[in-house]
């Protein structure tokens, strides 16, 4: 029996979309693969990705990541045209695609990218079916977060 490889030090997360959790209620999450070009993989290994403005388009029975920015490396090949904001195809199975189509078309949800990470040697994107928050929802979340920080600070100082 072979030994399992030791986990590499460092985080597997490439990019997070913190704004999505602030602006949307995330109802359901899916893991999807990405169809990438060689220079994009090289950029991701260097951690040069931004998904803060990205969302998922559902068209012709397929899902596409739109608005993600992968900054090309300076040492990437010169004979390939590098488009940092190109639309990338998401690799999902048919059941997941049908679920996304149903939620988006019927119930008025949207699909946003939540995080970009490595799973073994493959780059994966976590997408979420989301519904927009109102302004008062955002304010109540902010108050709750501040209260949690204050509570932790009080408990820390109470032990002294």
Curated annotation (Swiss-Prot):
Keyword Ion transport belongs to the record: no
Record-linked PROSITE patterns: SSRP (PS01317)
Annotated GO biological process: trans-translation
The keyword Magnesium belongs to this UniProt entry's keyword annotation: no
Compartments (UniProt record): Cytoplasm
One Gene Ontology CC term in the entry: cytosol
Record key words, sorted: Cytoplasm, RNA-binding
Any Pfam family: SmpB
Gene Ontology MF term list: RNA binding
HAMAP family for this protein: SmpB (MF_00023)
Chain's role: Required for rescue of stalled ribosomes mediated by trans-translation. Binds to transfer-messenger RNA (tmRNA), required for stable association of tmRNA with ribosomes. tmRNA and SmpB together mimic tRNA shape, replacing the anticodon stem-loop with SmpB. tmRNA is encoded by the ssrA gene; the 2 termini fold to resemble tRNA(Ala) and it encodes a 'tag peptide', a short internal open reading frame. During trans-translation Ala-aminoacylated tmRNA acts like a tRNA, entering the A-site of stalled ribosomes, displacing the stalled mRNA.
Family, per entry: Belongs to the SmpB family.
Name of the molecule in the record: SsrA-binding protein
Source species of the chain: Citrobacter koseri (strain ATCC BAA-895 / CDC 4225-83 / SGSC4696)
